[in-house]
Amino acid sequence: MKTTINIATPTLKKPSKEANLVASIYGLLFVCGAKGITLRELIRIFKKAGIEKVKLALLALERKLADDEQSGVELKKFGNSFSLVTKPIIKDYLHLLLAHKVKNPLNSKAMEVLAIIAYNQPCTRPRINEIRGVDSFQIVDDLIAKELIVELGRTDKPGRPFIYEVSAKFYDLFGIDSLDQLPKIEHFDLDKFKQGSFFDSNRYGDE
């Protein structure tokens, strides 16, 4: 007589709503990249969950990534936006990687415009042009393409110019957590822009 052995298929545990919310926010942060995503946007997207649950999910994700020794990223808040950035522990390896791909990633003009935005944000193109004394249209577009600055919208002034601020990638690239860590304004030196060293942009050069 043939004996049939029934092997039970393990039942996969269905993720909780809280876990799904954390995972969903994690996925959105990954897709948004350097631009990041604001709390307001998250609340709009997950309006059924509510403000408090979204905040708790962000906190849970922050702790999860911080405690996970096998994760090379962490959750950071820059201004009004949340972004995924690399952990300090892998900075040295990141430098080695980029040393083969990037040397002086920004020229002097780009460094100058980037610094103007960092010190005057939120900043418009007319304001940048006013400070530099020349048109900066293409440079601003290049910085957007490099994901070092982001558009925040438009002002109500004539012409409704776009408003810009530095992105999470800016903080990550230059190894700072806030604009307070930039050189103080009393030490502001335009010559350093032209040398490409104001933000220590040469740190990804040959070692």
UniProtKB/Swiss-Prot annotation:
Pfam families: SMC_ScpB (PF04079). One of its GO terms (cellular component) is cytoplasm. Keywords: Cell cycle, Cell division, Chromosome partition, Cytoplasm. It is found in: Cytoplasm. Its main location: cytoplasm. GO terms for biological process: cell division; chromosome separation; DNA replication. The keyword Cell cycle applies. Disulfide bonds: none annotated. Participates in chromosomal partition during cell division. May act via the formation of a condensin-like complex containing Smc and ScpA that pull DNA away from mid-cell into both cell halves. Homodimer. Homodimerization may be required to stabilize the binding of ScpA to the Smc head domains. Component of a cohesin-like complex composed of ScpA, ScpB and the Smc homodimer, in which ScpA and ScpB bind to the head domain of Smc. The presence of the three proteins is required for the association of the complex with DNA. Belongs to the ScpB family. This is Segregation and condensation protein B. It comes from Mycoplasma genitalium (strain ATCC 33530 / DSM 19775 / NCTC 10195 / G37).
